[in-house]
Amino acid sequence: MATPMIYDALIIGGGPAGLAASLALARVCRTSMLFDSGEYRNEGAKEMHTFLSRDGIPPHDFRATCLQQLEKYKDYAYVTNTKITDIANTDVAPGLKGFKAVDFTKKEFFGRKLVLATGTEDVLPTHIEGYKENWPVHIYQCPFCDGFERKSYPIGLLTFPNPSYSHLALMLRPLNKDITIYSNGPVPTDEPTQTALKMVLAAGVKLDERPVRRLINNGDGPENGISIEFTSGATVKLGMLYHRPPTRSRAANLILQLGLETNAIGDVITDTMMLKTNVPGCVSAGDTQENMKQASVAAATGTRAAASIVFQLADEDGKKALAEAHL
């Protein structure tokens, strides 16, 4: 039986974080196997934004460009389209601790280190008719990613459940002063939320508390936009609607298997500088651990995760050489 290859790192996730980690490792001749499940948070989005030199690029084209550039490093950067279902921190060779990953076909892969960069997914509400049909073509969650191209049209903010929505409302005002909060019923009466609401109303943001019956996709482009139909009164038409659905990790099962520590919303806890987790040899990058879930930030953390692994590998190799030299 052939001895399985042990990569310097296994990278789970084919988004900006995982791709950046693969590139950085290859640049210093460290081998990696990247697993791309084909699941992406920005699936359905027509363009990526706020990514220097790639502003406006379709996500599919961005990934294709990344993979094309990785071909230069084919002796170091390996990529396979599969989904990892099981992961273990275990011996991968006599006296060598590492990670064993198993994909959905039961194929096994081994690595000295692990980059967990599976990302997150948005949990879309199911109780609002038409929401899914408008996401992410007319409903957005990040003004840095989407909005500039539609700034000439009225803006809506769906719900106002807590004070954090005041920041989003005020961030949107420079795009267009015609912005309305559609709270889908009464705004919560707790003091922090009401104080935040008073602040945005004082800034000129309007409030409509009518219950929403359904959201209507009027067609492509802001000139068609999205309409909100209420249980009573006139329908309104907008160029775009902002809403922040909760997110969940795509790798909840892997996080559980490894015993990784997470915060209250399920993101993996890492140290700020080296992105190390509580499991030695495992680092996390991108939306899996980052509060600011954006492509450019994810790519930056992927590079940092790779550097962290390179430092660890170099240190281990040096200590091994010293021990074997008996100096």
UniProtKB/Swiss-Prot annotation:
Its cofactor is FAD. SUPFAM superfamilies: FAD/NAD(P)-binding domain (SSF51905). GO terms for molecular function: oxidoreductase activity. Pathway: Mycotoxin biosynthesis. GO terms for biological process: cellular response to toxic substance. FAD binds at residues 14-17, 36-41, 49, 84, 117, 287, 294-295. It is an enzyme of class 1 (oxidoreductase). The keyword Flavoprotein applies. Its EC number is 1.8.1.-. Induction: Expression is regulated by the cluster-specific regulator verZ. Keywords: Disulfide bond, FAD, Flavoprotein, NADP, Oxidoreductase, Redox-active center. Belongs to the class-II pyridine nucleotide-disulfide oxidoreductase family. This is Thioredoxin reductase verT.
